[in-house]
Each structure stands twice: as structure tokens, then as C-alpha cells.
């Protein structure tokens, strides 16, 4: 709805809307209740004096400070957090301890009572203690029994006597061959070489 053009005209100083709020309140007649006593307007009564029940609007007294509002604790009613949690730490109540991989495959080691009694006597004498396991292997290490542990070592196979004699003959022939290259061989070596023909190579059956 368009406003009337009268609001653009200058407002006279005696107009009721031109005066301040305090001047308008002063111009109002005093209100009286049924008994005839003086009663302030509600706007003046609300701003002049604070209510007695609100402690924040009252001026602070010298003896006791105004009561402060108690802050609600964050941890009240919360079952997942501690009262004073440490910074940068995770909650470990629900986490189960991880089993160690080194002790998964072993049962607890039981030492017989005879070894214990012998160890106490050896400890008094200053001798090393006796253990039920060899001292080179640690107690908590798991060593799988696989055939590929010692793969770098050559396999020890039984060698037949025929193959052993053949290997010795090949070595002796190599020695004679190197001696022939560096110098003339002796007559004994030549006669021995002519008398013994080279036997055919035979593979030993395992």
C-alpha cells in the first residue's frame, strides 16, 4: 500500500512523534490504580530499576560476588569418553592386544624340576646353566622345517667307487696335460699314458 505524501513534509517540533521518548513519557499523565496511588508506566518501571529476581542485572555487592552459572560438564552422560582424557591418545578400552607373531607357534616351555635343581647347584659353582633346548636356538623363534633352508650348500650324495676312480683319473690327466704344454713330459709319464688307455666315461647310477 503506498504511503501518503504527508510524511515528506517537515514535521513540526510540537508534533507528538517528533519528541523523544522521555519527553513523551513526561507529558503523559500519571497513572493511578484503584486505590488512587501513583503508578509508573510499564516502560519506565522496566528500565529504571532491575527486577529483584535476576542476579545479572543487580550491581555487584562488596561482600559476595554474584553467583555464576555452573557450566555443564561435557563428559556427563557420555560413556565413551573419560573424565580427563590425555591429549593425543586413543581409547584402548575396546582394543584387544595383538598377539606376538614369534610366540604364536609355541607352547609355554616347561623346565623339569631336575634341571632346576642342577641349575641351582651349577649357579653356586659359577658354571653355565643347563637348558632343555640347545643354546644356539633362541627359545621364542619359530623355524619352519622346510627343505629349502640350506639350498646354498651342495647336496651330499653317495658316490660310487667307479665314479670316484674316474674323477681321480680325469684329475691326473689334466695335470699331465698342463705339464705337456709347459714342457716336455718325462718318459715314465709317456709310457704310463700309452700303457693305460682311457676308459670310457660311465655315469654312476644313484
Curated annotation (Swiss-Prot):
Query: Where is the stretch described as Disordered?
Result: 1-153, 179-206
User: According to the UniProt entry, which residue ranges have a biased composition of type Polar residues?
Assistant: 97-120, 132-148
Please note every region of biased composition (Basic and acidic residues): 74-96
UniProt family annotation? Belongs to the UPF0328 family.
Q: Provide the protein name.
A: UPF0328 protein ECU01_0050/ECU01_1560
Amino acid at each position: 500500500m503506498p504511503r501518503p505524501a504527508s510524511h515528506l513534509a517537515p514535521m513540526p517540533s510540537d508534533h507528538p512523534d517528533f519528541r523523544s521518548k522521555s519527553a513523551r513519557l513526561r507529558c503523559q499523565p500519571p497513572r493511578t490504580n484503584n486505590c488512587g496511588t501513583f503508578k509508573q508506566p510499564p516502560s519506565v518501571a522496566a528500565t529504571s530499576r532491575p527486577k529483584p529476581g535476576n542476579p545479572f542485572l543487580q550491581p555487584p555487592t562488596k561482600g559476595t560476588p554474584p553467583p555464576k552459572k555452573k557450566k555443564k560438564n561435557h563428559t556427563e552422560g557420555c560413556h565413551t569418553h573419560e573424565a580427563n582424557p590425555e591429549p593425543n591418545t586413543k581409547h584402548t578400552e575396546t582394543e584387544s592386544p595383538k598377539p606376538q607373531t614369534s610366540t604364536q607357534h609355541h607352547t609355554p616351555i616347561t623346565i623339569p624340576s631336575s634341571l632346576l635343581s642342577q641349575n641351582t647347584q651349577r649357579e653356586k659353582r659359577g658354571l653355565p646353566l643347563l637348558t632343555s633346548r640347545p643354546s644356539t636356538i633362541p627359545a621364542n623363534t619359530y623355524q619352519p622345517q622346510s627343505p629349502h633352508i640350506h639350498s646354498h650348500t651342495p647336496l651330499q650324495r653317495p658316490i660310487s667307487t667307479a665314479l670316484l676312480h674316474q674323477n681321480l683319473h680325469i684329475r691326473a690327466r689334466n695335470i699331465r696335460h698342463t705339464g705337456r704344454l709347459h714342457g716336455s713330459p718325462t718318459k715314465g709319464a709317456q709310457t704310463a699314458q700309452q700303457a693305460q688307455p682311457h676308459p670310457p666315461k660311465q655315469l654312476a647310477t644313484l
